[in-house]
Amino acid sequence: MIVIDGSEGEGGGAVVRVSTALAAVTSRSVRVYNIRARRSRSGLSHQHLTAVRAVARISNGTLRGDELGSMELEFSPGRVTGGTFNFDVKTAGSTGLVLQAIMVAAAASEGEIDVTVSGGTDVLWAPTCDYLREVTIPVLEMMGYSARIEIIRRGYYPEGGGRVHAIIEPSELRPITLEESEIHAVRGISHSRNLPVHVAERQAESAMKILRGAGLDVDIMVEDASGPVGRGSGITLWAEGNTRLGAVSLGKPGKRAEKVGSEAARELLGFIESGSPLDRYMGDQIIPYMALTGDSRVRTCELTLHAETNIILSEKITGRRFRVEGERGGPATIEVL
């Protein structure tokens, strides 16, 4: 059994999610202790618990210690054979983080996985489902991955109530080399729920002004996501070309719609101008998949602590060895041997 110190690296829930997901796809048992030990609320939260239970379900595995607040977890996977699954975070916890774990675990599935996850689709400190659909999956498709995501209903903090549906097809991953970017357009979606429609419109207009000012071809769809539960707003932007880059900003009380749009636009513009083909978020998301294929090399605009942590976990669980050229906080080339 592989033993992982949950306080290692970034020390958050990603350690548990990535460890269990890689354990499932490599058929290796894992024990994680000190889970989120340095966080103000240590142990497993609702979204982390949902993620590890989802990985166990789809891999026909067994869990010990899967309780709210648990500081230690043991996981022994079975086989990922496919099937239909439903998971509910029960709060505004991130559906995107749950899907991230499922997607890694499903990388070697023998059959199609049809999964629905309920919770928050557009929440802080997590990839939005738009980002997964428009950035993560297109980049992974370059490695042979096959999946599609549909947002059935958006969910914002604190009420949640969102629902996302994903279908993941059996696939054979292949190595990737991605070191330069060629961007030809920017697309996006600006959305709001139970707020005046001009909120989403102003978010989009603010983003377009900045991006068009930089000479980019920009089109941002405005979506009225109004429904029976909660309210909120946000915008997800992505750059299209030989790769995908993405940026997200969410609204909150007292935050002007123009600021929401400009935040995402300026972050995306920085990613584009870096010349790197992976943004700072995809730079860590791709690492478990690189560990599964080997012989891959990518460049990211920023080496983050999350990326470094994923490298440590991937090396421990898969036995692969990574080499990094660059320093944390700056651009870097990541290679797996």
Curated annotation (Swiss-Prot):
Its EC number is 6.5.1.4. One of its GO terms (biological process) is RNA processing. It is an enzyme of class 6 (ligase). Keywords: ATP-binding, Cytoplasm, Ligase, Nucleotide-binding. The keyword Signal does not apply. GO terms for molecular function: ATP binding; RNA-3'-phosphate cyclase activity. ATP binds at residues 100, 281-285. InterPro entries: RNA3'-term_phos_cycl_insert, RNA3'_phos_cyclase_dom, RNA3'_phos_cyclase_dom_sf, RNA3'_term_phos_cyc, RNA3'_term_phos_cyc_type_1, RNA3'_term_phos_cycl-like_CS, RNA3'P_cycl/enolpyr_Trfase_a/b, RPTC_insert. The keyword ATP-binding applies. It holds the Pfam family RTC. The active site is at residue 306. It catalyses: a 3'-end 3'-phospho-ribonucleotide-RNA + ATP = a 3'-end 2',3'-cyclophospho-ribonucleotide-RNA + AMP + diphosphate. GO terms for cellular component: cytoplasm. Belongs to the RNA 3'-terminal cyclase family. Type 1 subfamily. Catalyzes the conversion of 3'-phosphate to a 2',3'-cyclic phosphodiester at the end of RNA. The mechanism of action of the enzyme occurs in 3 steps: (A) adenylation of the enzyme by ATP; (B) transfer of adenylate to an RNA-N3'P to produce RNA-N3'PP5'A; (C) and attack of the adjacent 2'-hydroxyl on the 3'-phosphorus in the diester linkage to produce the cyclic end product. The biological role of this enzyme is unknown but it is likely to function in some aspects of cellular RNA processing. This is RNA 3'-terminal phosphate cyclase. It comes from Methanothermobacter thermautotrophicus (strain ATCC 29096 / DSM 1053 / JCM 10044 / NBRC 100330 / Delta H) (Methanobacterium thermoautotrophicum). The lineage of its organism: Archaea, Methanobacteriati, Methanobacteriota, Methanomada group, Methanobacteria. The gene is rtcA.
